């Protein structure tokens, strides 16, 4: 169980002392409910320093969040801060720039297997299969890794849709908010990518959540990437609503993944 918790990059601190000092708000523009939502957001996505074992000020964590998103580092809640906090996003905590996951975990085999074990009812199964294949190809075009799908048994990356508590200690929260999460490369749950079944998943339509975009993001985590602070990056933590069919990895995404695996030789 301990290993399971440490595998996911989204290790959430739930201890009451994690956010030791209360947040303040600018000009009374934030409601009590939003104040509570902000505290919960910082507990989830901006973790305390486990090495020093010191209680972390909520103000410091808010400044860290403001720095990540390119906002003035006031340490105070504002409507702009709340707007970002309320956007749909990935369930993995934020780091900085194109960053890698702690200890830079990666796959050491040149062939990585994957298996899709459950589906959304919003899209035909064959289309989900095609989208996952396309998302993985975006990454494999940049690095010397190949992906092989298996239909049964074990696989390096297990992909599926689930709702609520789905057995990994990180339950989904219904429509909106957390869209999915993924585990760093490794044994057991390592590499697995989960998507919230309660979202309305689409294939690039004007409404709903673009599955290709979110799948590409989560599978980036499955390969070892953390979040990027570059808004145009696929690895940016909040959902950008990019519905275009021809979106691609940015220079930031490519730099991150090639730092882990090197470049694919072009013939």
From Swiss-Prot:
<dbReference type="InterPro" id="IPR036365">
    <property type="entry name" value="PGBD-like_sf"/>
</dbReference>
<dbReference type="InterPro" id="IPR033739">
    <property type="entry name" value="M10A_MMP"/>
</dbReference>
<comment type="similarity">
    <text>Belongs to the peptidase M10A family.</text>
</comment>
<dbReference type="GO" id="GO:0030335">
    <property type="term" value="P:positive regulation of cell migration"/>
</dbReference>
<keyword id="KW-0378">Hydrolase</keyword>
<dbReference type="GO" id="GO:0042742">
    <property type="term" value="P:defense response to bacterium"/>
</dbReference>
<feature type="propeptide" description="Activation peptide">
    <location>
        <begin position="21"/>
        <end position="97"/>
    </location>
</feature>
<dbReference type="GO" id="GO:0050830">
    <property type="term" value="P:defense response to Gram-positive bacterium"/>
</dbReference>
<keyword id="KW-0106">Calcium</keyword>
<protein>
    <recommendedName>
        <fullName>Matrilysin</fullName>
        <ecNumber>3.4.24.23</ecNumber>
    </recommendedName>
</protein>
<dbReference type="InterPro" id="IPR001818">
    <property type="entry name" value="Pept_M10_metallopeptidase"/>
</dbReference>
<dbReference type="GO" id="GO:0044849">
    <property type="term" value="P:estrous cycle"/>
</dbReference>
<dbReference type="GO" id="GO:0030574">
    <property type="term" value="P:collagen catabolic process"/>
</dbReference>
<feature type="binding site">
    <location>
        <position position="196"/>
    </location>
    <ligand>
        <name>Ca(2+) 2</name>
    </ligand>
</feature>
<feature type="active site">
    <location>
        <position position="218"/>
    </location>
</feature>
<feature type="binding site">
    <location>
        <position position="227"/>
    </location>
    <ligand>
        <name>Zn(2+) 2</name>
    </ligand>
</feature>
<dbReference type="GO" id="GO:0030198">
    <property type="term" value="P:extracellular matrix organization"/>
</dbReference>
<dbReference type="GO" id="GO:0005615">
    <property type="term" value="C:extracellular space"/>
</dbReference>
<dbReference type="GO" id="GO:0004175">
    <property type="term" value="F:endopeptidase activity"/>
</dbReference>
<feature type="binding site" description="in inhibited form">
    <location>
        <position position="90"/>
    </location>
    <ligand>
        <name>Zn(2+) 2</name>
    </ligand>
</feature>
<keyword id="KW-0177">Collagen degradation</keyword>
<keyword id="KW-0964">Secreted</keyword>
<dbReference type="GO" id="GO:0031667">
    <property type="term" value="P:response to nutrient levels"/>
</dbReference>
<dbReference type="GO" id="GO:0006509">
    <property type="term" value="P:membrane protein ectodomain proteolysis"/>
</dbReference>
<comment type="function">
    <text>Degrades casein, gelatins of types I, III, IV, and V, and fibronectin. Activates procollagenase.</text>
</comment>
<dbReference type="GO" id="GO:0031293">
    <property type="term" value="P:membrane protein intracellular domain proteolysis"/>
</dbReference>
<dbReference type="InterPro" id="IPR021190">
    <property type="entry name" value="Pept_M10A"/>
</dbReference>
<dbReference type="GO" id="GO:0002779">
    <property type="term" value="P:antibacterial peptide secretion"/>
</dbReference>
<dbReference type="GO" id="GO:0009986">
    <property type="term" value="C:cell surface"/>
</dbReference>
<keyword id="KW-0479">Metal-binding</keyword>
<dbReference type="GO" id="GO:0008233">
    <property type="term" value="F:peptidase activity"/>
</dbReference>
<feature type="binding site">
    <location>
        <position position="221"/>
    </location>
    <ligand>
        <name>Zn(2+) 2</name>
    </ligand>
</feature>
<dbReference type="GO" id="GO:0006508">
    <property type="term" value="P:proteolysis"/>
</dbReference>
<keyword id="KW-0272">Extracellular matrix</keyword>
<feature type="binding site">
    <location>
        <position position="181"/>
    </location>
    <ligand>
        <name>Zn(2+) 1</name>
    </ligand>
</feature>
<dbReference type="Pfam" id="PF01471">
    <property type="entry name" value="PG_binding_1"/>
</dbReference>
<dbReference type="InterPro" id="IPR002477">
    <property type="entry name" value="Peptidoglycan-bd-like"/>
</dbReference>
<dbReference type="InterPro" id="IPR021158">
    <property type="entry name" value="Pept_M10A_Zn_BS"/>
</dbReference>
<dbReference type="GO" id="GO:0050829">
    <property type="term" value="P:defense response to Gram-negative bacterium"/>
</dbReference>
<keyword id="KW-0732">Signal</keyword>
<dbReference type="InterPro" id="IPR024079">
    <property type="entry name" value="MetalloPept_cat_dom_sf"/>
</dbReference>
<feature type="signal peptide">
    <location>
        <begin position="1"/>
        <end position="20"/>
    </location>
</feature>
């Amino acid at each position: 169980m301990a290993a399971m918790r440490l595998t996911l990059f989204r290790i959430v601190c739930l201890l009451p002392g994690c956010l030791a000092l209360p947040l303040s708000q600018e000009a009374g523009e934030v409601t009590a409910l939003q104040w509570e939502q902000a505290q919960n957001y910082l507990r989830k996505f901006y973790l305390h320093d486990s090495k020093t074992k010191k209680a972390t000020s909520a103000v410091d964590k808010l400044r860290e969040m403001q720095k990540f998103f390119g906002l003035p580092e006031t340490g105070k809640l504002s409507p702009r801060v709340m707007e970002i906090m309320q956007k749909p996003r990935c369930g993995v905590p934020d780091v900085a720039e194109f960053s890698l996951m702690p200890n830079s975990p990666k796959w050491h085999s040149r062939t990585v297997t994957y298996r899709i074990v459950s589906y959304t009812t919003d899209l035909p199964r064959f289309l989900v299969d095609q989208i996952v294949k396309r998302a993985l190809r975006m990454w494999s075009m940049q690095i010397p890794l190949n992906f092989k799908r298996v239909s049964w048994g074990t696989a390096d990356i297990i992909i599926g849709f689930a709702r609520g508590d789905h057995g990994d200690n990180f339950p989904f929260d219904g429509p909106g908010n957390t869209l999915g999460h993924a585990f760093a490369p490794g044994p057991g749950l390592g590499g697995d990518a989960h998507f919230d079944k309660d979202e309305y998943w689409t294939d690039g339509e004007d409404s709903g959540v673009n599955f290709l975009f979110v799948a590409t993001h989560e599978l980036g985590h499955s390969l070892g990437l953390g979040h990027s602070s570059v808004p145009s990056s696929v690895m940016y933590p909040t959902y950008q609503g990019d519905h275009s069919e021809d979106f691609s990895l940015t220079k930031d995404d490519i730099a991150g993944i090639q730092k882990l695996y090197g470049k694919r030789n072009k013939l």
